[in-house]
Design a protein with these regions (language model features):
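N-terminal Rossmann-like NAD(P)+-binding domain of SDR-like oxidoreductases, especially those catalyzing
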Residues: 1-120, 249, 253, 260, ...
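Short glycine-/acidic-enriched loop or helix-start segments at secondary-structure transitions
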Residues: 29-30, 71-73, 124, 156, ...
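Conserved active-site region of classical short-chain dehydrogenase/reductase
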Residues: 42-50, 128, 160-163, 167
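Conserved sequence/active-site signature of Rossmann-fold short-chain dehydrogenase/reductase
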Residues: 68-69, 120-122, 152, 162
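Hydrophobic alpha-helix immediately C-terminal to the catalytic Tyr-X-X-X-Lys motif of short-chain
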Residues: 96, 100-104, 134, 209, ...
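C-terminal substrate-binding subdomain of Rossmann-fold SDR/epimerase-dehydratase oxidoreductases
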Residues: 138-271
Length: 271
């Protein structure tokens, strides 16, 4: 929505909690259309934070991304790891929103939680995501593109787990009073600001992921093996110990179960 429409809604309802999930997502498209990502992700998030400041929200939760870990080689990824080597424009915009949010939190003491999602999949997802593209290709007997010759791992996280993870944090705003309370905490030392991973904590081999889809559809994929694409990372894997300590929650859906649930929805929705 336009900023004016957004402002009217925010000032009308004056929510105590704001969960900001809107963004322009996707690594490859960000290389083609970087300005779209700058406007949507950076300016869009700035607009939300500015409005949150004006109504004194009790907790602002903002979606970030595992892509901010970039070339980080420490596995699993922890919130306290250094994140200065983003590999795509998309990842850079997400890292930028984290920095902007921290500055606002420091100056105006807005309690902000940045949530780094790991490869979210499931019903009602984006059609450009791997699971959608693989499913459509296999069903239509078209070749599916497999990057880096399939030598990739992803921490696939089912949408229900992401939603539950976010909801578990709603009433857990960061506070400077919590300094030193949790081990390996990402809580800022100067602001009520914290970063949290929401992931499945399992790295899944891409070819195993595809095989699980084939098994459910009882159809073999026609595969087109390709090189690693610009901006892509070879592996993602989350450490969610902080999420468990703070909110008592750990994502639990196995990828084969998630694929089965997705395909049931997909076949029904697309008939």
């Amino acid at each position: 929505p336009s900023v004016s429409i957004l402002s009217k809604s925010i000032f009308k309802f004056k929510p105590k909690i704001i969960i900001h999930l809107a963004a322009q997502a996707g690594v490859r498209y960000s290389i083609e259309k970087p300005r779209v990502y700058l406007n949507s992700n950076i300016i869009g998030t700035y607009n939300i934070i500015e409005l949150a400041k004006k109504i004194n929200v009790k907790h602002l939760l903002i979606a970030s991304s595992s892509s901010v870990y970039g070339a980080n080689k420490n596995l699993p990824f922890k919130e306290t790891d250094k994140t200065q080597t983003q590999l795509s424009i998309y990842a850079s915009t997400k890292k930028s929103t984290e920095s902007i949010a921290h500055s606002y939190s420091n100056i105006w003491k807005i309690p902000i939680s940045m949530l780094r999602f790991f490869t979210v999949y499931g019903p009602w997802g984006r059609p450009d995501m791997a699971l959608f593209k693989f499913t459509k290709g296999i069903m239509n007997k078209k070749k599916i593109d497999i990057y880096n010759n399939g030598k990739m791992y992803r921490d696939f996280t089912y949408i229900d787990d992401v939603v539950e993870g976010v909801c578990s944090l709603i009433n857990k705003p960061p506070s400077l009073k919590q300094l030193g309370k949790f081990k390996n905490d990402s809580l800022s030392t100067i602001a009520p600001f914290r970063i949290l991973n929401i992931g499945n904590t399992n790295k899944v081999y891409l070819l195993d992921f595809i095989s699980a889809i084939e098994k459910e559809l009882k159809t073999k994929a026609k595969r087109k093996y390709m090189s690693l694409q610009k901006g892509d990372v070879k592996i993602t894997l989350s450490n969610t110990n902080l999420l468990k300590k703070i909110a008592g929650y750990n994502p639990k859906t196995k990828y084969k179960t998630g694929i089965k649930k997705f395909l049931k929805w997909y076949l029904n929705y697309y008939n």
